[in-house]
């Protein structure tokens, strides 16, 4: 039905007859000549119909936005005065000779030109129309090229694309599972996989050595801007490779991807330990474009007569840290109060501050409600450590170390945006040496997942002192977003059983949930390691989209619903009866 895509017609085609198909982006009658902007996935081209062909002209005069049409015509160069530098095809136009309306279009329920006026509900309900917008089409085409580039790299490096089951068994991976009832086994359920973690480990035990999969994963969790109930991973696993080798290979892949797709050289990725990241930035995924850093000052405040500072300064689990904001002395009291409310979201009880109005005047040039509790030597040392200058403000976080890290880390990001401090476009890094476990309500939980290997200890040593052990894990971070995370896996039964015990998983529970894994570990399991990247997040960053919903063809809303299909929906009674399921409480369908 066509000879060329609309966006591919150029000056080399002048004089040629072309056949184009697509949608009417815009149609206008100017002085007896119809100008038609025809659109397909590759772009726009202008088609001109004049009255010399009355029958064709009559049809062209009836066209409205989003009619699906076929155009036949001759390519001609535009006069210099009419060249449109904003269009890829702006040097040419097509003189229409024939026109077929393939399908007319009713008036659209949403605007494709002024899409900012469309609600997200509208955009998702009429997603097939929203995806006609060039911006959306370009993102999905970009995504297709990224997945193709990833496959080429992994294929050329000996990785095998192997599918793993979608219907599987529930395993504790941090989020709720989506359950699928079994008709054959009444009262029993499959779970949709949160990741192919155990299957890819089993593939290493099977001897496949290098595996990858671009795979759908499912998590029934609370949604945020960068979360969806179903999402796509670039899943990778290797045998006989160390964590250093896995990081080197996947860094090579990511650097090549950015160079090919964006012509950006990311350079060599720096390394940073988890402890350093939390200390300096209050986050295990620091945005290195932001020059602001947290500075510890607890050692200066142990003896001050101000319990807000001295109590956490003398508490082993407490922390006092400050954040210097260049130019922040200009903040009004209301703006400081707004920052105080902001850190309160993260559990902080307040936000002390110190304005450096004039450094040359000593204490006289400093304004702060806590200045009366601090002597001159303490103030001078705080100024020295932070590098504060006249016109700056120093903000104080004093609380439990976890609260200080989270609240001041979030404030660092907000201040960086508010004061336009971000430097550079792309700042990648590896974060390494994560703790094996974290304590929540007195119980140990795996920081990554329960199959992550510790670094440099035996099973007995791990059980004897689990709190201070470091995992052989690594996260790739870019601009404050975790692109992917991975680890060396446990490859012997003794260590895996020890980790289960530390996590409070009884032997019976371990056998019931992971018996197949524990048995597999008895039969010559090779050392193995891997990593999984969030494809949606990578595309979001590379395209500058504000949400992963804008780089997925048919995403869910923030309430995990699909306005297009009205999913989830109620099952009919016969289906439920076959599954042995009775709905005991009336379900309320949430719009949104």
UniProtKB/Swiss-Prot annotation:
Top class in the EC scheme: ligase
Annotated catalysed reactions: tRNA(Asp) + L-aspartate + ATP = L-aspartyl-tRNA(Asp) + AMP + diphosphate
Record key words, sorted: Aminoacyl-tRNA synthetase, ATP-binding, Cytoplasm, Ligase, Nucleotide-binding, Protein biosynthesis
SUPFAM superfamilies linked: Class II aaRS and biotin synthetases, GAD domain-like, Nucleic acid-binding proteins
Entry keyword S-adenosyl-L-methionine: no
GO molecular function, one term: nucleic acid binding
Functional note: Catalyzes the attachment of L-aspartate to tRNA(Asp) in a two-step reaction: L-aspartate is first activated by ATP to form Asp-AMP and then transferred to the acceptor end of tRNA(Asp).
Protein name: Aspartate--tRNA ligase
Protein's organism: Shewanella putrefaciens (strain CN-32 / ATCC BAA-453)
Highest classification ranks of the organism: Bacteria, Pseudomonadati, Pseudomonadota, Gammaproteobacteria, Alteromonadales
